[in-house]
C-alpha cells in the first residue's frame, strides 16, 4: 500500500496536490483512508473511492500542508 500523488493539469486547483492511497487489499485501503479522514483530513477528501480497484478517495492537499499530510500518512501506514 502506498500514497500516490496524481498529476493534475488544471488551473482551478492551482496550489493543491491530489493524493490517493493505492493498494491490493481494498479493506486496508478503506481503513487507511478513514484513519486519515479521522486525523483531520475530512474536508480535503473528495469522497469518491474506488476500493474494488484498490484506490481510496482522493485528497486535495494545499502545498503548504503536504509535509503534515505525508507525516500523518506514515502514522496511518504503520497502524494498518
Curated annotation (Swiss-Prot):
InterPro entries: DUF5417 (IPR035392)
Protein name: Uncharacterized 9.5 kDa protein in frd-Gp32 intergenic region
Amino acid at each position: 500500500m502506498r500514497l500516490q500523488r496524481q498529476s493534475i493539469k488544471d488551473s482551478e486547483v492551482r496550489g493543491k496536490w491530489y493524493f490517493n492511497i493505492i493498494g491490493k487489499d481494498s479493506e486496508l485501503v478503506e481503513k487507511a483512508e478513514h484513519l486519515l479522514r479521522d486525523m483531520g483530513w475530512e474536508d480535503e477528501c473528495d469522497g469518491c473511492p474506488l476500493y474494488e480497484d484498490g484506490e481510496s478517495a482522493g485528497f486535495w492537499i494545499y502545498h503548504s500542508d503536504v509535509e503534515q499530510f505525508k507525516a500523518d500518512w506514515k502514522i496511518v501506514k504503520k497502524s494498518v
